[in-house]
Amino acid sequence: MIIYLHGFDSNSPGNHEKVLQLQFIDPDVRLISYSTRHPKHDMQHLLKEVDKMLQLNVDERPLICGVGLGGYWAERIGFLCDIRQVIFNPNLFPYENMEGKIDRPEEYADIATKCVTNFREKNRDRCLVILSRNDEALNSQRTSEELHHYYEIVWDEEQTHKFKNISPHLQRIKAFKTLG
């Protein structure tokens, strides 16, 4: 089972395309939708939905994937639910760059302070990070500097922030899932 979390643009047709691409790894791909506008509510909702899916799951190696803001959530929810994560161009600093787009961006900073201390150290090697060198929305170099101590970083030379085509990375993702 692969759980997919969309980014800020929840209505993007690219979400459906990524789900179809992920089905080459596992036919059981589940999209969880969330508001993107209310961080604390989103965290509760995502934890509850992922937990529900894991209770009914028969896959011994489930995976959670997310793009952009979905990557922010996939890393945290995956850690809390003890499943491996794959994150594409994760938005690690939504409290800095989502001002005016969501109701309470400061809640992201609050969530960060309430998260498990040194959670990335405890999550070491359980997350695969795929970054675009052509990310027009986020500073991928800053993201790499933040995460490379804990996780493998894979660089993509072609895609932009929304990562429309993940197919060149499917074999790597499949191998990572199999390690689960």
From Swiss-Prot:
Entry GO terms, CC: cytosol
InterPro entries listed in its UniProt record: AB_hydrolase_fold, UPF0227, UPF0227/Esterase_YqiA
A Pfam family that the UniProt record links to this protein: UPF0227
Chain segments annotated as transmembrane: none
GO MF terms held by the record: hydrolase activity, acting on ester bonds
HAMAP family, alphabetized: UPF0227 (MF_01047)
Family to which the UniProt record says this protein belongs: Belongs to the UPF0227 family.
Name of protein: UPF0227 protein YcfP
Organism: Escherichia coli (strain K12)
Gene assigned in the entry: ycfP
